[in-house]
């Protein structure tokens, strides 16, 4: 068991739909991939009365003009004992697509984010993680994670 799994998170990472940035590209789709341990949930951008939404801050990045999240449709979870404590979010996995706008068209990018998210099971906790991805300039090919991103994009 990884240390993060003690807090309900199996992994948090940045993934990309493409292996590289095309020389004509002004943007690329990347995603924050959050895999949760069984029975844990995380929150949507508007999590309900008591939740903590996933938030990120761009740090130490190169060729990054802007990052815009595209939230997949969430689900409402109702607490059977305390129905007023319902939450809006995701279970098992959240792949949050991000539109990465480049400062310089067709140049590689290094993206580093500080991510914070609330997770709940019988108790709730805040998890913080620094994640990064390097995207070189080149001939882009689909990554093995491209399908995960496409599935989430279809739910936006």
Language-model-detected regions and their locations in the chain:
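Extracellular/lumen-exposed scaffold segments
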Residues: 1-156
């Amino acid at each position: 068991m990884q240390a993060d799994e003690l807090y309900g998170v199996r992994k948090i990472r940045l993934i990309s739909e493409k292996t590289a940035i095309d020389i004509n590209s002004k943007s690329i789709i990347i995603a924050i991939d959050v895999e949760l341990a069984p029975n844990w949930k995380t929150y949507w951008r508007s999590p309900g009365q008591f939740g903590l939404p996933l938030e990120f801050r761009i740090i130490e990045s190169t060729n990054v003009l802007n990052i815009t999240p595209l939230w997949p449709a969430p689900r409402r979870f109702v607490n059977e004992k305390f129905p007023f404590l319902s939450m809006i979010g995701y279970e098992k996995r959240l792949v949050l697509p991000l539109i990465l706008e480049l400062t310089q068209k067709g140049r590689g990018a290094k993206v580093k984010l500080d991510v914070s998210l609330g997770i709940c099971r019988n108790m709730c906790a805040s998890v913080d993680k620094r994640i990064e991805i390097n995207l070189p300039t080149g001939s882009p090919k689909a990554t093995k994670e491209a399908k995960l991103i496409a599935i989430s994009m279809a739910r936006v």
